[in-house]
């Protein structure tokens, strides 16, 4: 190893006394200090493991409550629901998910391929503009399109004035329907598919696509048989996110009077007053979520085609004439329908009509929104840092399992979270109130139910995945040697 006999002898003696050599240089270490540091390191790992486990329990409360409801006694309300309206909930939810999956696939994959593989006027602007509809809540877009496309709206009024027809004499699609809800939700959620599939086209499909084109394949054949299969995991991942958000949607389907799981849960709880039946309905809904998670995890498995197609950049084809104009139009339509029309309509109403009472309550609205947003963000980031550092220090299977369970909340629909959290929190509040009333004659009231704390709790469970992925990506960019250097100082 390039050391002299004298240095080799000193190195052998150092193995006993605690002196360590590396490349002939002398580093003094204390064996006792190393032993103590190892013991402290084991204790630290146990602390991080326990912390990650407690966080997973904290975030899994809604799931635990819902799963335990399956073993609760059956009520008359649940018997009525399971025999009468449950098939309708299942059918409408599946039909809504199928339509949304179809629409978002067509819009997302089509625009992703055009912006990734072709060159046309406005491509650079449309590449980021196609993400804008994701910023609009689906129920707000539903309000706007209902106002525009309803019988008394400007669109049908213009049709009647131009044609002279009356109600019932012409066909116009009903916006407040299941198909209308699928259309609205698709306009808002297609960017999930667009973003993931576009990256897959650029990074994974380039080599195989160029090879197919070199061997004489037509552009459509190379896209359909080569590029699209290589991007299948990204497409399935995007669709899984879209369908989870579709399951979670309540405002759109409730406003359009479409009976789905989300509307059924709240209707069972608040209209029928049966929490147990609502929890059982949420458990059925949770089975859909689990199925989507399993499908998404299964399609993450790497394939040979994906491994081959990782290198290279996709060469864009220059479009000209009517083809280029058509590509521009196809990419402009989702932006106009999903972002510009809703945003422009709301801005027009705000400027022309407005609300005279807005100034009195607007400050309070902003304050409440900022309070909840900042509190949830701070709590989620702190918890995410704990999970990230636990993974960094230990990287054990137990910690990784705790992290996977803790970040499951992003797949939980809002209705499921509401039912799964409200039931145990309300029971806890009643138990505390009863204890203080009986023991100290103090009326505490409800400490958590109906407060900002429970809302923040729900948001943390829902969006901890986003916070963890961001912090973990940043932490992985920091070499572990920095941690060791800091501890040595």
Describe every region a protein language model picked out.
Residues 343, 358-489:
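C-terminal structured domain segments across diverse proteins
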Residues 53, 102, 132, 136, ...:
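Transmembrane alpha-helices
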Residues 27-30, 34, 42-48, 55, ...:
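C-terminal transmembrane helix and the adjacent membrane-cytosol boundary/short C-terminal tail
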Residues 35-38, 75-79, 83-87, 122-125, ...:
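Membrane-interfacial helix termini and adjacent extracytoplasmic/periplasmic loops
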Residues 99-130, 143, 147, 197, ...:
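Transmembrane-helix boundary motif in ABC transporter permease subunits
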Residues 44, 176, 250-290, 320-324, ...:
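Interhelical loop and adjacent transmembrane-helix boundary motif
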Residues 42-45, 49-88, 93-98, 152-153, ...:
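Short membrane-interfacial helix/loop motifs at transmembrane-helix boundaries
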Residues 215-216, 229, 489:
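Glycine/proline-centered hinge or cleavage motifs at structural transition points of membrane proteins
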């Amino acid at each position: 190893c390039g050391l002299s006999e004298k240095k080799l002898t000193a190195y052998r003696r150092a193995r006993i006394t605690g002196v360590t050599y590396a490349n002939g240089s002398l580093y003094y270490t204390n064996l006792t200090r190393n032993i103590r540091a190892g013991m402290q390191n084991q204790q630290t790992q146990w602390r991080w493991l326990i912390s990650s486990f407690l966080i997973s329990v904290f975030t899994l409360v809604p799931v635990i409550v819902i799963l335990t409801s399956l073993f609760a006694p059956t009520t008359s309300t649940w018997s009525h629901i399971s025999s009468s309206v449950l098939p309708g909930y299942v059918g409408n939810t599946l039909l809504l998910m199928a339509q949304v999956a179809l629409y978002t696939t067509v819009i997302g994959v089509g625009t992703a391929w055009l912006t990734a593989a072709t060159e046309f006027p406005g491509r650079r602007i449309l590449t980021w503009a196609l993400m804008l509809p994701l910023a609009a809540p689906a129920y707000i877009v539903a309000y706007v399109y209902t106002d525009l496309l309803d019988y008394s709206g400007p669109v049908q009024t213009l049709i009647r004035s131009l044609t002279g027809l009356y109600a019932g004499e012409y066909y116009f699609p009903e916006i407040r329907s299941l198909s209308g809800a699928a259309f609205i939700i698709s306009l808002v959620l297609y960017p999930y598919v667009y973003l993931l599939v576009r990256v897959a086209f650029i990074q994974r499909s380039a080599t195989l696509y160029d090879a197919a084109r070199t061997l004489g394949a037509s552009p459509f054949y190379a896209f359909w048989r080569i590029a699209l299969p290589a991007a299948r995991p990204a497409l399935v991942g995007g669709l899984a996110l879209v369908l989870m958000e579709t399951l979670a949607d309540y405002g759109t389907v409730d406003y359009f009077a479409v009976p789905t799981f989300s509307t059924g849960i709240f209707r069972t709880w608040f209209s029928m007053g049966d929490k147990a039946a609502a929890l059982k309905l949420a458990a059925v809904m949770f089975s859909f979520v689990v199925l989507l998670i399993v499908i998404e995890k299964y399609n993450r498995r790497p394939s040979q085609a994906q491994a081959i197609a990782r290198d290279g950049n996709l060469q864009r084809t220059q479009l000209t004439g009517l083809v280029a104009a058509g590509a521009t139009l196809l990419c402009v339509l989702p932006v106009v329908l999903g972002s510009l029309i809703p945003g422009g309509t709301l801005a027009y109403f705000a400027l022309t009509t407005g609300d005279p009472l807005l100034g009195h309550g607007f400050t309070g609205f902003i304050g409440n929104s900022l309070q909840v947003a900042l509190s949830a963000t701070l709590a989620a980031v702190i918890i995410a840092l704990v999970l990230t550092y636990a993974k960094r220090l230990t990287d054990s299977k137990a910690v990784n399992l705790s992290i996977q369970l803790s970040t499951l909340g992003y797949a939980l629909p809002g209705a499921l979270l509401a039912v799964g959290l409200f039931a145990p929190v309300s029971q806890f509040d009643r138990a505390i109130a009863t204890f203080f009333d009986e023991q100290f004659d103090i009326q505490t009231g409800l400490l958590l139910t109906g407060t900002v704390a429970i809302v923040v709790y729900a948001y943390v469970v829902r969006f901890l995945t986003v916070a963890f992925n961001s912090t973990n990506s940043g932490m992985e960019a920091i070499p572990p040697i920095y941690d060791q250097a800091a501890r040595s100082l």
